[in-house]
Amino acid sequence: PAEQVPILQKMIVEKCNSAGKPVIVATQMMESMIKSPVPTRAEVSDVANSILDGADAVMLSEESALGEYPVETVAMMSKVALMVEQNYPHREALYGDTFEGGSGVNDEYKDIVDAVTFGAVSTASTVGAVAIIALTETGLTARMLSRFRPKQPIIVMSPKRHVIEQI
């Protein structure tokens, strides 16, 4: 039923974040912009709430592929995303600015990668690092770091070109 969609979306995003899996919210995010240069209030809220829920990406489809205002649509979605990320009053809850008392994801480490990546993000936050550098063969380290939502950018290096292209 339609009334369950918002709750199910939040649950799916949360489960993906907990598992360190990238999650994209897509489909009809800015549908009115197929024919109009201005989105509806509900569409702007959908984009913002997807970001606040912890989505790694929001994606357009028909709006940018077939719509009359593709550039304006991409620009508007970008403006909404940046506004939410920069001005959310509880930014530390969104991005894990503070790590005392747990990660907000899962206080029990599943394995050594989980423990080490949490430690790296926690340390980066404590010392005020400007970036986190991840060396990876498969991309797993980068994905696991990103699940903790550090405020620092994650710079990924790999000897395997396909891993970098995938990330």
Residue spans for each PLM region:
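C-terminal helical cap(s) of enzyme catalytic domains, especially alpha/beta-barrels
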Residues: 9, 64-87
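Hydrophobic faces of well-ordered beta-strands that scaffold small-molecule active sites
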Residues: 23-27, 51, 58-60, 154
